[in-house]
A protein has these predicted regions:
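A conserved FAD-binding loop/helix module that cradles the flavin
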Residues: 381-405
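Mid-domain catalytic core of redox enzymes
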Residues: 169, 173-287
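Helical element adjacent to the flavin cofactor pocket in flavoenzyme catalytic cores
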Residues: 133-181, 187
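A glycine-rich dinucleotide-binding beta-alpha-beta segment and adjacent secondary-structure elements
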Residues: 107-124, 271-275, 322-386
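N-terminal FAD cofactor-binding segment of flavoenzymes
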Residues: 1-23
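Conserved FAD/dinucleotide-binding core of flavoprotein oxidoreductases
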Residues: 42-45, 196-202, 229, 288-315
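Rossmann-like flavin
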Residues: 29-128
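Short beta-strand to alpha-helix junction loop
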Residues: 85-99, 140-162, 304-308
Length: 407
């Protein structure tokens, strides 16, 4: 999402973004695949009888994106700058992704393409607002693509750190902070932490009512991550899948919906929806000559310690026979492992909290500014604030603006 972020755009960071020919590919058991390309028209034509429905759904959003993005990437409750465009988006976005895709499209190809994008919500596809994630991600495919930074995601952090230091900022790492009292005196403190961590850091300084609100914050399913070193590119049955930087592995809408429902309800799906990135196809410096990598994750129950590697491999092998033969090594992390590495990832939840209707509106509390706390000098700026998870920097950007406006 960095390519579409007003914040990153304003910084003018010296990043080289790599945009594959297709944002995402979705393979099927018959050896075919559907791809979302930058060209909306080309993508629509690939959907056959659903071409018209796809155009009608996405074209108005693409045409209004320049204004719409400023309304989408901010708190849900706000005075819209482009009310008509936002209303057009909202009518569809509020719906549940499964029934929405079924009512909009006739073919399994179009329904599955939408379901794969909507599954980024970490919600059952029967839940309200899950359609919003499908709309936004397919919209981004056509307005900015799904690019990634050449050299790896670390270059984004390095560029941001360099900009901060150029302005006189300092960064201290390798130090555990257990209380806000450990911080040096300052007029403002912005915490990029989960609500649970904020309560632990601030303690009784926060009013009891606000602490109780943060304690009720619900975290969503976790992820199981598997990173593969490969001795060659993934041998997809549908060769065109190699044109995409991201691959959604999950078959039909019904299968994806079952996977997301299982994770939400505490079960480990036998055929999980897998998100796979194959970036060495387009950024060769990430692997030795002739070798490749693939990073993957699937959704699992909150706090899971279950090893999903075999199920992930089976899902990839299903659409790329011979994949297992190309594995040189694999590094895995359970949901609990991820939380141990980063305490913000409560139970392995990488979204900062469940993306339910209530938690999108009150994220993490219903306040005039969701970034503010009852303490006038303390602000929250993590993915648990609007607009939520993603590499867009808008949570911190909007929190900083709110803090400065408050004085």
């Amino acid at each position: 999402m960095a390519a579409a972020s007003p914040f990153f755009e304003s910084l003018g960071l010296e990043l080289e973004l790599v945009e594959p020919p297709a944002a995402v590919a979705h393979p099927f058991d018959d050896g075919s695949a559907v791809l979302a390309r930058r060209s909306l028209e080309e993508t629509a034509r690939s959907l056959g009888v659903d071409a018209g429905a796809y155009r009608r759904l996405l074209t108005p959003l693409v045409e209004s994106w320049a204004g719409l993005r400023n309304d989408l990437l901010r708190p849900v409750v706000h005075w819209p700058r482009h009310p008509l465009a936002l209303a057009r988006f909202g009518v569809s976005a509020i719906r549940s992704a499964g029934p929405f895709a079924t009512s909009r499209f006739e073919t399994e190809r179009a329904r599955a393409l939408f379901a794969g994008a909507a599954a980024h919500s970490f919600l059952p596809l029967e839940q309200p607002v899950s359609a919003s994630f499908g709309l936004v991600l397919l919209l981004l495919a056509h307005v900015s693509g799904w690019p990634f930074p050449r050299g790896g995601s670390q270059v984004i952090a390095d560029a941001l750190a360099a900009r901060l230091r150029s302005l006189g900022g300092e960064i201290e790492t390798g130090r555990q902070v257990s209380s806000l009292a450990e911080l040096p005196p300052s007029r403002l403190v912005l915490c990029d932490v989960a609500p649970r961590q904020l309560v632990a850091l601030a303690g009784d300084e926060l009013p009891a009512r606000y602490r109780r609100r943060l304690a009720r914050w619900r975290y969503g399913p976790g992820v199981f991550k598997a990173d593969f070193a490969l001795d060659g590119p993934i041998p997809w049955s549908a060769p065109e899948v190699a044109e995409a930087g991201t691959v959604h592995i999950g078959g039909s809408l019904a299968e994806i919906a079952a996977s997301e429902r299982d994770a939400w309800e505490g079960r480990h799906c036998e055929r999980p929806f897998v998100l796979l990135a194959q970036q060495t196809l387009f950024d060769h410096a990430r692997a030795p000559l002739g070798k490749h990598t693939a990073w993957t994750y699937c959704h699992v129950p909150h706090g899971s310690t279950f090893d999903m590697r075999d199920r992930i491999e089976s899902q990839i092998e299903r659409f790329a026979p011979g994949f297992r033969d190309r594995i040189l090594g694999c590094s895995t992390r359970t949901a609990v492992d991820l939380e141990h590495e980063n305490p913000n990832l409560i139970g392995g939840d990488i979204s900062g909290g469940a993306n339910t209707v209530g938690q999108l509106v009150a994220r993490p509390a219903l306040r005039p500014s969701p970034y503010s706390t009852p303490l006038p000098w303390l602000y929250l700026c993590s993915a648990s604030t609007p607009p939520g998870g993603g590499v867009h920097g808008m949570c911190g950007h909007l929190a900083a603006k709110a803090a400065l406006a408050r004085g």
